[in-house]
Amino acid sequence: MRECISIHIGQAGIQVGNACWELYCLEHGIQPDGQMPGDKTVGGGDDAFNTFFSETGAGKHVPRAVFVDLEPTVIDEVRTGDYRQLFHPEQLISGKEDAANNFARGHYTIGKEIVDLCLDRIRKLADNCTGLQGFLVFNAVGGGTGSGLGSLLLERLSVDYGKKSKLGFTVYPSPQVSTSVVEPYNSVLSTHSLLEHTDVAVLLDNEAIYDICRRSLDIERPTYTNLNRLVSQVISSLTASLRFDGALNVDVNEFQTNLVPYPRIHFMLSSYAPVISAEKAYHEQLSVAEITNSAFEPSSMMAKCDPRHGKYMACCLMYRGDVVPKDVNAAVATIKTKRTIQFVDWCPTGFKCGINYQPPSVVPGGDLAKVQRAVCMISNSTSVVEVFSRIDIKFDLMYSKRAFVHWYVGEGMEEGEFSEAREDLAALEKDYEEVGSEFDDGDEGDEGDEY
């Protein structure tokens, strides 16, 4: 088996995690108490979904997941929610005090006390696997727990499981919408370790997803639940080929191989199509070509950056539902002819496609329509650098005055760590600039202005 362990850290990680596991259960017909009426091989078996769920002798299916937070309220919602019987109580780890939006608290003072317990639980899950493939790590980098404890856990996972791949689903701060004043600090400090310790990181950003909900689903005031359900569709599409037997399966390691040209350049954009409400879906049938085109629309991107400002290096298209390879090839050929979608000249093919015949499921009473086919795109584009440069500018404004720095130093950090992390990100911006302009004959002189 090729098992994956999911690790959900901090409020964002846990709430996205809830949406994901709810969707996985629906897709596999697993009830909230973990029973699965449709399962033929009770108590074991090598069904494809066993990559994400382990089975007990009593026929109960338990997610291979750990939820960690430094304060109890969010995890208590899982402990009392609809799916409380799904998880083993040991998998829900909560501390007593908050990281208070402070990276240093999450990474040094408070995170340090809980991290061994987490690694213990992860070790138990790993021992329960026959062929652990890697980790999916969910967190946000704006807060204290997701950024601080998230980085700490990633660093420790690198030590304990060096060769296993780590995929991150990371919520980055939005350009306009901010949830805390010190977001830029936490993000820069956290990205510093994401650079080193994740193999692929998918960037998500609340504002971009708000806009998609508002525009495509006609939700006037989207809640986090709306956002998370959309994100869970993306993550479900990515992991579908691990959980179902498909036509063109895509492994976790394949994402890495196909999307990451250089180790540091591993921050991905994601998009999902079709995002339509039930009343709209009633009137339109979406072909493979149409959903492929809309996945490439700049407005479909789940992070606020415009792919037209950069070039694509590689791109992974995961189709699910009623899709045949012939349609996919035609759709991809059309995309290649478009002038607005530019690939770097050193990567001429750039497309990796996966097809899974399991049609997308939707949460009952949710906002998304039930459709026959859907596509999820993960792309490596140089335009991602816009996300970083935005944060860096805000970081510099605050750090030039050393505003709020004493909170971090008081928790045992050194000022040198700020400048080290900031230099690392400056180097990353430079890396992206170079990748975008390699082998250029100088016919595009405006390449430098975008960054």
From Swiss-Prot:
The keyword Acetylation is annotated on this UniProt entry: yes
Active site, per annotation: 254
Modified sites of kind N6-acetyllysine: 40
Domain of life assignment: Eukaryota
Gene Ontology cellular component list: cytoplasm; microtubule
Any single GO BP term: microtubule cytoskeleton organization
Binding site for GTP: 11, 71, 144-145, 179, 206, 228
EC number assigned by the record: 3.6.5.-
Post-translational modification as stated in the protein's UniProt record: Undergoes a tyrosination/detyrosination cycle, the cyclic removal and re-addition of a C-terminal tyrosine residue by the enzymes tubulin tyrosine carboxypeptidase (TTCP) and tubulin tyrosine ligase (TTL), respectively.
Main location (coarse class): cytoplasm
Record field: catalytic activity: GTP + H2O = GDP + phosphate + H(+)
SMART domains linked to this entry: Tubulin, Tubulin_C
Assembly information from the UniProt record: Dimer of alpha and beta chains. A typical microtubule is a hollow water-filled tube with an outer diameter of 25 nm and an inner diameter of 15 nM. Alpha-beta heterodimers associate head-to-tail to form protofilaments running lengthwise along the microtubule wall with the beta-tubulin subunit facing the microtubule plus end conferring a structural polarity. Microtubules usually have 13 protofilaments but different protofilament numbers can be found in some organisms and specialized cells.
Protein name: Tubulin alpha-2 chain
Annotated source species: Oryza sativa subsp. japonica (Rice)
High-level lineage: Eukaryota, Viridiplantae, Streptophyta, Embryophyta, Tracheophyta
